[in-house]
Curated annotation (Swiss-Prot):
Belongs to the KdpA family. The chain crosses the membrane at residues 5-25, 27-47, 63-83, 132-152, 170-190, 253-273, 283-303, 327-347, 356-376, 379-399, 416-436, 484-504, 524-544. Keywords: Cell inner membrane, Cell membrane, Ion transport, Membrane, Potassium, Potassium transport, Transmembrane, Transmembrane helix, Transport. The system is composed of three essential subunits: KdpA, KdpB and KdpC. GO terms for cellular component: plasma membrane. This is Potassium-transporting ATPase potassium-binding subunit. It is found in: Cell inner membrane. Part of the high-affinity ATP-driven potassium transport (or Kdp) system, which catalyzes the hydrolysis of ATP coupled with the electrogenic transport of potassium into the cytoplasm. This subunit binds the periplasmic potassium ions and delivers the ions to the membrane domain of KdpB through an intramembrane tunnel. It is a multi-pass membrane protein. The lineage of its organism: Bacteria, Pseudomonadati, Pseudomonadota, Gammaproteobacteria, Enterobacterales. HAMAP family: KdpA. The gene is kdpA.
């Protein structure tokens, strides 16, 4: 089993790196605002048609453009969901959503969280899925990538005040990166058996003679961008454990690769844009190390079996509860770590049924900010925040002004870095405390004791860090939970983006200082270790008390 796990991890990372490197080169061209080959003429027509100028924006203008797009999308999506019954492509005649569920769902998909307090096949029409959720899957992913583009330009430019044109970046990211790659993935899914139609649900008779209604819909197209954009919201309630979303072992591998593809490619793009590929590789090494360790821990925990079943005399050599037999325990464990290391949240197994330690690792990966590869764009700018914190700590130890890529890191940058890093832990801890203090919060818990608390902590961690996965033993479709999690999702997304853009605006105007003998090398093994230590230290100090009350207590209470 250990050899199989090693081969699975190694082959996954090898294929990922082979695919990510060429995509990173394309992303680097977009960061430099250089049109991809053969599309310059098309872009000129688009700019004239859409009224987009070549005028570059400062950080406030860039941020305002992104906020305007996202708030407009939030309002439109809310209306689509609330008045769903009056809109077309609703063969099952499904009613509109309640105001609190519509708000929660709209915020969820606009913020790239895709938390779902509903069952897709029994709640949403095809029009809501296509014109509402799928569109936001593209736009929320493009927003995250645009933010990291602006931050990377802040490091690579000097003595200017502009970070690019947000509208041009959003169009280029969507048309030349997200759409073509998602199209290829969708065609592969269709070939593997994922439905793509607008048919009404199909009544069938099973082999046992029972009547059943099979859900249909444009699944493959949404599934592709769901994974590529690290969105994670499933067309069906069972998400990627549903055979219509994830029918084969090949689609399972393709989905995991799609989740990490752009986050890994952005590391290569960062190195190329910075003029030193070692900088991108250093971040990639740090992410990969944490990722491999986490996968190994989850695989080990799940292979141990379920102690409750063993105590009852059942044969439980491995913990297969909540897992699909077509994937097995190792692929399910790998998927769980991939989806929570990134801000995806798609699941091919029920995380609520993992062992205590096996479920704690995905929860912790979310709590540290999902900087291990992370979401498209958000993972890299989140890791760069920890880079700034790491060079600041190193500067304190050696008595030098911290700098990164030749840019001095001053008080303003560190204040914004601290604010961005502290936003999500505050939301998680305060939100969990509020839920446990109120009857409305506790009434949603279907399990008592440490596991019940873990379900609450996981839900708020998932929302605040824009992941979207859940311990399914929480009945979260209530006004209290819909509003609480919507607030956490919105602040967790834009409460980090705003200080990141402020950092970019401050750094872009600074001059690049030449390296000297006292300059900390940020591409070597020493700095990689310092960066990993910084991520682990912040995660440990912030969340160990809460984790001790949940999964740790549950683990030590096992028979």
């Amino acid at each position: 089993m250990a050899a199989q796990g090693f081969l699975l991890i190694a082959s996954f990372l090898l294929i990922l790196l082979v695919l990510a490197k060429p995509l990173g080169s394309g992303l680097a061209r977009l960061i430099a605002a250089v049109p991809l080959p053969g599309v310059a003429g098309i872009e000129r027509i688009l700019w004239r048609t859409l009224g987009i100028t070549d005028h570059e924006m400062n950080w406030r203008q860039y941020l305002l453009a992104l906020l305007t797009l996202n708030l407009l999308g939030l309002g439109i999506l809310f209306c689509l969901l609330f008045w769903q019954e009056w809109l077309p492509l609703n063969p099952q005649r499904l009613p509109g959503l309640s105001w609190d569920l519509a708000l929660n769902t709209a915020v969820s998909f606009v913020t790239n969280t895709n938390w779902q307090a509903y069952s897709g096949e029994s709640t949403l029409s095809y029009f809501s899925q296509m014109a509402g959720l799928t569109v936001q899957n593209f736009l929320s992913a493009a927003t995250g990538i645009a933010v990291v583009f602006a931050l990377i330009r802040a490091f690579t430019r000097q003595n200017v005040h502009t970070l690019g044109n947000a509208w041009q970046d959003l169009v280029r990211i969507t048309l030349w990166i997200l759409f073509p790659v998602a199209l290829i993935i969708a065609l592969f899914f269709i070939q593997q058996g994922v439905p793509q139609n607008l048919s009404a649900y199909q009544p069938i008779t099973t082999l046992e003679g029972a009547k059943q209604l099979l859900p249909m819909g444009p699944v493959a197209s949404q599934e592709a961008i769901k994974m590529l954009g690290t969105n994670g919201g499933g067309f069906f309630n069972a998400n990627s454990s549903h055979p219509f979303e994830n029918p084969t072992a090949l689609t399972n591998l393709a989905q995991m690769l799609a989740i990490f593809l752009i986050p890994a490619a952005l590391c290569f793009a960062f190195g190329e844009a910075a003029g030193d590929r070692r900088q991108g590789r250093a971040l990639l090494w740090a992410m990969s190390f944490i990722f491999v360790v986490c996968v190994a821990v989850v695989m080990w925990a799940e292979v141990q079996g379920n102690p409750h079943l063993l105590a009852a005399g059942a044969d439980s050599s491995v913990n297969m509860e909540g897992k699909e037999t077509r994937f097995g325990v190792l692929a399910s464990s790998l998927f769980a770590v991939v989806t929570t290391a990134a801000s995806c949240g798609a699941v091919n197994a029920m995380h609520d049924s993992f062992t205590a330690l096996g479920g704690m690792v995905p929860m912790w990966l979310m709590q540290i900010g999902e900087v291990v590869f992370g979401g498209v764009g958000s993972g890299l700018y989140g890791m760069l925040l920890f880079v700034l914190l790491a060079v600041f700590i190193a500067g304190l130890m050696i008595g030098r002004t911290p700098e990164y890529l030749g840019k001095k890191i001053d008080v303003r940058e560190m204040k914004m870095t601290a604010l961005a890093i502290l936003v999500t832990p505050m939301l998680v801890l305060l939100g969990s405390a509020l839920a446990m203090m109120t009857d409305a919060g506790r009434s949603a818990m279907l399990n008592p004791g440490p596991h019940g608390f873990s379900e609450v902590l996981y839900a708020v961690s998932s929302a605040a860090n824009n992941n979207g996965s859940a311990f399914a033993g929480l009945s979260a479709n209530s006004p209290f939970w819909n509003c609480l999690l919507a607030f956490c999702m919105f602040v967790g997304r834009f409460g980090v983006i705003i200080p990141v853009m402020a950092i970019a605006g401050s750094l872009v105007s600074k001059k690049v200082q030449p390296a000297s003998q006292g300059t900390l090398a940020t591409h070597g093994a020493l700095f990689i270790g310092l960066l990993i230590g910084t991520v682990l230290l912040v995660g440990a100090l912030t969340f160990i008390p809460a984790l001790a009350l949940g999964p740790v207590a549950e683990h030590f209470s096992l028979p």
